[in-house]
Structure formats: structure tokens, C-alpha cells
Amino acid sequence: MTLNDKYPFTDEDQAIINSYKAVVDGVSALIGEHCEIVLHSLENIEHSAICIANGHNTNRQVGSPITDLALRSLRNMQSESVSKPYFTRAKGSVLMKSVTIAIRNKTQRIIGLLCININLDVPVSQFLQCFMLTEHTNETSSVNFANSVEDLVAQTIEKTIEEVNADRAVANNTKNRQIVLSLYEKGIFDIKDAINLVAERLDISRHTVYLYIRQIKQEQE
């Protein structure tokens, strides 16, 4: 793609580009205010920046033009989708470590760029503060990292059994139902064959699991 290689975006192109706005917000939420994320649309390179998070790092705003470095990266990304990490320092600006990701449409044409820039002039203590738990941080949530869907279901079942068994408020004769309720709330029954795995682990029939689920749904209506 060159500067003279312009063409009007289709509705699908626009939808693809706009879908990356959530990525901008997500990366910003994860890494923090010292990471600038810029989404460029190549439909109009004079005003290519259509979404920016933490633009205070370079004083850029929505509507800013594409950078010369991004243009050079574009020329080198016809076969690659992610640039090698690189360092930049604009005149009077901060030192940044950056990476550029090509956004392609269904014909593999590059229609946009996602640029992620980390401000290296920020003191390390400030940067790391974005990753530290504080009194205002939401309670941490447990997570299962599984290698297969079967492992995910099995791990979730075991953890749920432990949780229910540790709850003294749950009577022994209602524990299986409580386990099924908890698994239902965790969405585990959206996974194929989960009912069979739960029934086998709890040593109850599939019919019983279905009955518990049906009762839970009726109670929630």
C-alpha cells in the first residue's frame, strides 16, 4: 500500500476497523495510563487516528495524522502482521517502546494499524503501580487455565465441590444440588457433555442433573 493507493472503505472495512476500538480500551485498562494505544484507519492518513487511549503521553488526539514511522512500518508489513519492537523519541517528547500491528480486511489488504507505545521515561515505580493491588482494586477472582475443554470442566467441578463442602451452611443432603447450582451459575453447562461429566463425578444420574437445572431455571424466572 502506498500514499497513492487509496480506495474507499466498504462497510465491512469500517466494521473491522471499529471493532478494534474495544482492543484500544482493553489494552489501556490492562497496562495503564503510561501505555498509549492508537488506532489508525488508512482510509484517510491525513487524519488517520480514529481512537486513542492515553494520548497525553505524546499529546496526540483523535484526528491526528499517521506518523512517518508508521508509514515506513506499513511498507515493511505486506507479508508480516506485527512489527518488531522499536524505540522512538520525537523532538521534545518521551522515549517510547512500540509495536505496530497491521489490521487486514477479508482480502488481506491492510486497512488500519494498531500502535502500542509504552512510555519509558516514566519512573519504574509509577509504571509498576498500575499492576499492584490497592484498597480500591476489585477482589481477585480465581481462574482455571486448562489445556482442553474436558480439563476445564473437570477442574471447575473439583473446585466447586471443594467450595460447597467447605460451606457449613449447606446440608449434606443438598450438596449435590448446590454444586449443580454453582456450576450452572458459572456457565459450565454451556459446554458440550458437561452434564455427563458432572453426573459421573457426583455419582448421580443425568436425569437428576437435568432436574436440578430445570428447578434452578424455574426459581430464577
Swiss-Prot record:
Pfam families: HTH_22, PAS_6. GO terms for cellular component: cytosol. It comes from Haemophilus influenzae (strain ATCC 51907 / DSM 11121 / KW20 / Rd). The lineage of its organism: Bacteria, Pseudomonadati, Pseudomonadota, Gammaproteobacteria, Pasteurellales. To E.coli YheO. This is Uncharacterized protein HI_0575. Signal peptide: none annotated.
